[in-house]
Amino acid sequence: MFDNILEQQRIEKAKELKNLGINPYPHFLEKEMSLKTFKDRFSYILEQVEKRDESVNAVVAGRLKLLRIAGKSIFANIEDEDTNLQIYFSKDSVGEELYTILKKNLEVGDIVLVKGFPFVTKTGEFSLHASEVKLATKAIVPLPEKYHGLTDIEQRYRKRYVDMIMNAEVRKDFLVRSKVVSLIRHFFENKGFLEVETPMMHPIAGGANAKPFVTFHNSLGVERFLRIAPELYLKRLVVGGFEAVFEINRCFRNEGMDLTHNPEFTTIEFYWAYHNYKDLMDLTEELFALLLDKLNLGKTIEFDGKMIDFSKPFERITYKDALCKYGGLDRDLIEDKEKILTKLKADGFEANEKLELGHLQAELFDNYVEEKLINPTFVIDFPISISPLSRRSDEDSQIAERFELFICGRELANGFNELNDPLDQYERFLKQIEAKNAGDEEACEMDEDFVNALGYGMPPTAGQGIGIDRLVMLLTNKKSIRDVILFPAMRPLKSELKEKE
């Protein structure tokens, strides 16, 4: 560890500082303000003739990103989480002894505490004239080169801390993510929703069609499943009397990783008694309007080279109409299992003859429709067979009162009128068991306790989930989900695999 020559040189400098009575890792140093506050508060000197205010004695801190020695003075650039600032100090300003120590031992990457006053250099740069410089942390590992930075995409994800040091835009993206979560939370609180927390380990893998992660509870001697969705617990709370609930938390799905999928991801799920899925679509449009406004993004945003228009009401189109309009498929084809199988095979897609009509229609949708839904589009009225927890339509028993929101070819939200008939729910679970026995690893398990809860009566309720990660991708124009997750899942390095062997 820390065995390359540059790291060893820095370790020696840290030892030398200790020998001089300077702790390279002091337990506490207090700064007065951020660099942004310093710039904002003292910007008035830019309008003054003197271009300086020596009555100020401000204390700031930051990481050294640039260090330039010019004879008896040093110019440096420090950076905190918001911005950067040039600092200047000399033998005269900090004293010859300290100046000599700093000149010899300070390096790019070190974190310093600086006290001084604002001034403008001869070249016109707003700066801090330091009277005191203290080492807050000695960096042992050198930063990547300024102009090359951390360019290997895998290394950026594995060493997110270095990525954030080197790329201010990365920090900005995660500040946006934090703000998005905060805005969503306050949006629902202001609508009268109650935020709750439900279990992360489930006795039954339920709430969505997905393959779970399995763990083992040693004390109880039973298997547990990391949750794939909080849905069934949130609906139990509606049964219990909470009429509007939401949860922002993690879900886990033991499936593939790609540009839009990470095995660990964040969602908001919310349930609203005495409302229907049309109310949820209205609520979703209102939420998007709020986010675009508070993030100052305007009514049209760019994502992956495409312009997305939020100025108009979101399109609402039925599942079957979308197959025809966007998929270019004939109405008689989408209603005929054999014709669908023939079409899929002819176009080189997998065609499982064991699938029933609704699942085959879903194959058509995935392959011919989804990527063409660029502007915000609610696709409504899904096949009932692929919607095991949704309420059946009163007009058509093969249709679920369900929608999904698509933007730029990606699903961002899924909502529906909740199934509250316990007998119907029980039958749906039995069909899911049949599907699992036939080889569908993602089919739901039977959850008799949930059916029992419905037996006590759940009021007419609508529920929805929104993927926070994909939403942030959209709002920050990022193509990969790993760009909006601080520490995304990564494949093991070869060295890690060898150690296990």
From Swiss-Prot:
User: Which GO terms of type biological process are on file?
Assistant: lysyl-tRNA aminoacylation
Keywords, alphabetical = Aminoacyl-tRNA synthetase, ATP-binding, Cytoplasm, Ligase, Magnesium, Metal-binding, Nucleotide-binding, Protein biosynthesis
Which Enzyme Commission number(s) are listed? 6.1.1.6
User: Which cofactor names does the annotation list?
Assistant: Mg(2+)
**From what superkingdom does this record's organism come?**
Bacteria
Q: Which InterPro entries match?
A: Aa-tRNA-synt_II, aa-tRNA-synth_II, aa-tRNA-synth_II/BPL/LPL, Lys-tRNA-ligase_II, Lys-tRNA-ligase_II_N, Lys-tRNA-synth_II_C, NA-bd_OB-fold, NA-bd_OB_tRNA
Where is it predominantly found?
cytoplasm
The Swiss-Prot or TrEMBL record annotates one GO molecular function as: ATP binding
Instruction: Give its localization.
Output: Cytoplasm
Q: Which residues bind Mg(2+) 2?
A: 411
Catalytic activity as recorded in UniProt: tRNA(Lys) + L-lysine + ATP = L-lysyl-tRNA(Lys) + AMP + diphosphate
* Record text on cofactor binding: Binds 3 Mg(2+) ions per subunit.
The record lists Mg(2+) 1 as bound by 404, 411
One Pfam annotation, family name?
tRNA-synt_2
> Which PROSITE patterns does the UniProt entry name for this protein?
AA_TRNA_LIGASE_II
Per the record, its GO cellular-component terms are:
cytosol
Which PANTHER family does the entry mention? Answer: LYSINE--TRNA LIGASE, CHLOROPLASTIC_MITOCHONDRIAL, LYSYL-TRNA SYNTHETASE
| Similarity-based family | Belongs to the class-II aminoacyl-tRNA synthetase family.
Oligomeric state and partners? Homodimer.
- The molecule here is called Lysine--tRNA ligase
Native organism is Campylobacter jejuni (strain RM1221)
Task: Give the taxonomic lineage as stored in the record.
Answer: Bacteria, Pseudomonadati, Campylobacterota, Epsilonproteobacteria, Campylobacterales
